[in-house]
């Protein structure tokens, strides 16, 4: 599942370096991309969240921590 989440984010966010850790139904996601330049912290998180929204709404993932930064 970690690979699927990483691949979804990499497909949606250009030139992203992505790290995903999943333990049970909790995920920790770190994304670094120049794509985030000029975005607010909330907007960056929304961009990542959109990639996995279906996994959260289905209950597969319950708690998600997102760290999104520019290089």
Predicted regions and their residues:
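N-terminal, polar/charged subdomain of small-to-medium soluble alpha/beta proteins
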Residues: 1-39, 43-71
């Amino acid at each position: 599942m970690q690979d699927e989440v990483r691949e979804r984010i990499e497909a949606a966010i250009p030139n992203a370096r992505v790290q995903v850790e999943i333990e049970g139904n909790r995920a920790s996601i770190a994304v670094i991309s120049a794509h985030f330049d000029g975005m607010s912290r909330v907007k960056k998180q929304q961009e990542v969240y959109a990639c996995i929204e279906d996994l959260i709404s289905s209950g597969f993932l319950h708690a998600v921590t997102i760290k999104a930064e520019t290089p």
